[in-house]
């Protein structure tokens, strides 16, 4: 339920608020897309945490660049992969 609410808020922002503002995100994917992917992949709480952490890095003093959502750690090894 919380996951759906958070995703709805991000989609609302992407569709209705973001188009009204100049593009300023220093990252790829954008902070809103990153947050959306993080919530979809990691769930509501960890995804929201990752999204907020990313948004706090998005300022003129940070170089930005490619910054994908981190993968989940495999409990049986030290590698990461999608489930």
From Swiss-Prot:
Lineage: Bacteria, Bacillati, Bacillota, Bacilli, Bacillales
GO CC annotation terms, alphabetical: plasma membrane
Free-text function comment from the UniProt entry: Could be involved in insertion of integral membrane proteins into the membrane.
HAMAP family assigned to the protein according to its UniProt record, in alphabetical order: UPF0161_YidD (MF_00386)
InterPro entries found in the cross-reference section: Membr_insert_effic_factor_YidD
The species this protein was found in: Staphylococcus epidermidis (strain ATCC 12228 / FDA PCI 1200)
Membrane topology: Peripheral membrane protein
SMART domains with a match to the protein in the record: Haemolytic
Keywords tagged on the record: Cell membrane, Membrane
Any matching Pfam family: YidD
KW Cell membrane (keyword) present: yes
Domain of life: Bacteria
Subcellular location: Cell membrane
Name of this chain's protein: Putative membrane protein insertion efficiency factor
SS bonds (residue pairs): none
Region feature Disordered, mapped onto this chain: 64-83
Family that this chain belongs to: Belongs to the UPF0161 family.
Main location class: membrane
